[in-house]
Amino acid sequence: MKAEMKVELLSHTPSEAICATAAHCCVSQKIDIIDGEENIRKSTRHSIQSGHDSILEHWSATFAISGVSRAFLAQLSRHRLISLSVQSQRYVNMNGFDYVIPESIENDEKVKEKYVEFMRATSDLYEIMTELHNIKEEDSRYILPNACTTNIVFTANARELKHIFSLRTCNRTQKEFRDVANEMMKICKEVAPIIFEGAGAQCEITGYCVESRGCGKYPKKK
């Protein structure tokens, strides 16, 4: 069955003041709690503009991500400074698994028909293996496709989240990951607007493209 992607914020550091307080700690004789929206914004912005963005590591968020492909998981896991807990294909029976259909396949009726047939055939074989032949899930999972969906609990600090957003909201990013990144970024900007001020694709921040093959929205860096 075709899956629907969902991103949900499970928890986050309650106050943006933590980053401003950390910044103030570095240049003061004692630790003072920075409060007041304008003071927090001024301190945080000054630190980031000065290249002192390690203060962002004191703020973190945890997301639940569902209805995404194992192909997405492979890309997400390349970001090393994150914490992941993933639905196990070894212990969870995947009979009747959901799957992701990329937009290009969705828009080609003939290819989509064959694609869906393949997913159903794979699902049928998986069920035969696990139910009729008592082959364990840990071995039956070898036939599961990259399109098979998974559930993820994902935690990262604000510095790493902004780094992910700078790369994965780019038009060159595969659409599935771009959709997830944009949804996470939207949520982060709602709960921590000061910290995530200016978050987004690198080109939106710098005004030029650093990709070897850009989308054409911004000129290449000379």
Where are these regions (language model features)?
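Family-specific signature for flavin-dependent thymidylate synthase
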Residues: 1-222
